[in-house]
Amino acid sequence: MGAEEMAIAALGFIAADPALLPRFLAITGIEAQAIRNAAREPGFLAGVLQFIVAHEPTLIAFAENAGVAPAAVLKAMRALPQGDDSYDASA
């Protein structure tokens, strides 16, 4: 699973959880109706994974749900742009 695909899966995981979604919206300041457009931006997707990895129980739950190791989530997060020019869309 590529970095963007993992971030989109994480976004779905967040959206499906009635406790996580309000927390995500509050922390990011994004409105629910704006998520679809924002999800087209690799920087937003990096933020989704940052949200997941910032809370270990959420990271573990997502990794189990996605069938990946928690380290793979961290690797995907690092592969997405985070305000630098080193982003490689093919990673």
Question: What positions do the PLM features span?
Answer:
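Metal- and O2-centered redox machinery and metal/ROS homeostasis
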Residues: M1-A91
